[in-house]
Structures are given as C-alpha cells and as structure tokens.
Amino acid sequence: MSLLEATLFRGASGVVALHLVDEAVVDRPAGTGVSDHWSVLVLAGAVVAVAVVYPRLPSTGRALLGFIFVPLAGAGAAMHVMDARWNGAHGSDFTGFLLIPAAAAFVAAAVLAVLSRPRARSWPWRIGRWLLTAVVALLLLAFVSLPIAVGVAQTRKPGRSVPESAFATPHQTVTLHTRDGLDLSGWYVPSKNRAAIVVVHGGGGDRRGSRRHAAMLVRHGYGVLLYDARGRGESEGSPNAQGWTWQTDVSAALDFLSQRKDVDQGRIGGLGLSTGADVLLEAGANDPRLKAVVLDGSTSRSLADVRRLKTSDAISGIPYWAVAYGTIAALDQSLPGEPLVDLARKLAPKPALFIASNELGEPVVNRKYAAAYGNPRALWRVDAGHTRGLTEHPQEYERRVIRFFDNSL
C-alpha cells in the first residue's frame, strides 16, 4: 500500500468524523443535548477506528471500504450544498462542504487499492479479481452504502429560519409546547366558522411546504395551524424525516387548538402531506380530539409496513429498507409506530379521505389503506406528482377537500 493511498483514506475519514462531531456537539439541533446524539459520536469513533486499521487490510478490503464510503460522504455533501443553496450556508454546512473533496479522496484511495495488487498473476486472473471486486462493490453500494446514506440524511438535516413573509395570509406567530419539553414554531389563522385544521408538512421540509393548503382552508373560513415539526424549520429537537417522533408534535398542536376560544372542540381536523399524512393517520387512529383527516401522499414508514404491503416492489426492497430504517433507528434512537395498514383499520369509523398521486407507489399502498379502513371509496387517485394535487388540479382538489371537511366537521 502506498503512502498516498493511506493519506487519502485517512484524511477523508478524518473529515467525515469531524463533520459528525460538528453536527452532534457544536451545531446540534436546538433543544437537544450532546447525550441525545451519542449514537452519532459512536459512528464518528467507528470511522476513526476503520481509518486506523485500514493499512492492515488486504487490497480488496481497502478497495471495498473506499467504494462504501464514497456515497456516504457524497450524500452528506449533497445535502448540505442543497440546503445552503436554498437557505444560505450555516453552522455544520461548512464542514459538510469538506465532504466533497473527501468523497473524491475515497474514490482515489479505492482506485489505488485496486491497482496495488501484486502483478505476478496473469492478466485473466487479475481481470477476474477486478470484476469480482466491482460486483461486490456494487452490491455493497446498493444494499449498504446507499440505504445508510438515506438514513443519515433523514436524521441529520439542520433546521432553518422561516421568515414571516413566507406566508402571505394574515396570521399569528405561535409557539407550541410538546410534552417532552420542546418548543415548536408555527403560524395560526383564527377560525371564522368555529372549525380548525392542523396541517402537517412532509418529511423533507417545514411549514412553508403547506402554505398553499393552509391558504385554501382559510378561504373557506377554517382556522388553520401549520407548524415546523421537531428538528425542522425553526423548531427545536432532532429531525426524523420518517415522522417516527412526530406524534408528540401533533398532540401539542391539538393541545393548542383545544384551548382556542374560536374553535369548537368537536370540530378539529387534520390535513397531512407525505410524511405528515402518515403521522396524521396514526394520530387520527389514537387521538379522539382529531375528528377527521385528509391524508395526502401516504406511503410507508417502517419495515413492518413494507412487509405488510406484500407487493413485489415492497418485497424486493426489504433488504434496502432494513438497512435504511435500521440506520434511522440507531441515529435517532427512536422506533416507528404500528404498521400504517393496522392504523387505517383502527381509524374507522372516523371520517378520512386518502389521496394518492401517481408516484412512489401511492396508488397501490393507499388502496390497501382504504380497504383496511373499510371504505375503498374513501380513496381519491389524482393524476399528479407526489402531494401536488392542489398545484396541478387546484379546483378539483379544493372542491373535494373542502366538501370533505364541510361534511365531516
């Protein structure tokens, strides 16, 4: 092994470990302590340990390690570059940018490891070994590196400021207090018809992603509460794009609406988008304060969901999602709730409207949810992108959703 190869791998590993420590200690989410991120520090230690033993490994092992680390560093870098593009560089974004040269260094180290094998063997033997290494590397990429990268990205995205000007509808700025001690930032538009809707955004964004839906409801007199889930936007806490920890947030939103003098307690509904739909499906099944729910873009959020769906795509994806969900569970120190199909069964007879787009397998999974709910007619399939029904079919979307809430609340 050359000194250059060792330097490249160890230097890149040091950057990864530095970034993990930066996120877990220096730039950790508001409302959390270092102890809440011990699993990230363990991961940083594991990266350092791999770098220490790296020179002792055979060339094949070194090459595979390099290829495994490439997507991990690359995904982290891409996340911070995109976030900085939309929100401006902040905090751990700066060490996140260093992951770009780190990913390139891992590629270079892997190539050097492949080329460093003894040349005494014949060319056919060497080509065969290279091909075998490539096949194993691709398998590890598909079923280890990429799902781990997905899991890391869904638990590490930092919060960002949300300007008041982002929501043109006249509103009040409010703070929700969760039962586990976090403060969540939100906007509230008082009700004119004694009914109110809590709107829950998708896993990859914040309350700005549900502004158009909120404005639609306001036009028809509904009070609307939209807020940043924990770890998103301006809210405290650690992010979890699968929404496993969001039930306490919804409960805080319902606490807020239950105390409003402009809202009748029996007239509180919910509208969830993507992950927000999964979260409101669970909340609707378990919280009697929520009287009706619109679930726009539910998919799946756990390995149990994937197994229970029993579709060919779901079954083939089990190895991938087992690693991705396992990574999320380890880093966020949380677990998903009941399978969504079971929650759909528990949701009945509470009024529900399932909305499925043409993407992410939504038609298949939502047919199963509506069937478990006991009313296949509760499903509306809209010819649009994921949660883009209101954008691509505004009149029909507004008519269906408002009619549903008018009849249910």
Regions found by a protein language model. Give the residues of each.
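An N-terminal hydrophobic leader/cap segment in hydrolases
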Residues: 127-177
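Hydrolase active-site cap/lid region
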Residues: 154, 282-333, 351, 364, ...
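Short beta-strand element of the alpha/beta-hydrolase
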Residues: 194-202
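The serine-hydrolase catalytic nucleophile loop
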Residues: 203-216, 229, 236, 365
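Alpha/beta-hydrolase active-site loop
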Residues: 209, 240-261
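Alpha/beta-hydrolase fold nucleophile elbow
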Residues: 262-274
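Short beta-strand/loop motif that positions the catalytic acidic residue
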Residues: 347-348, 353-356
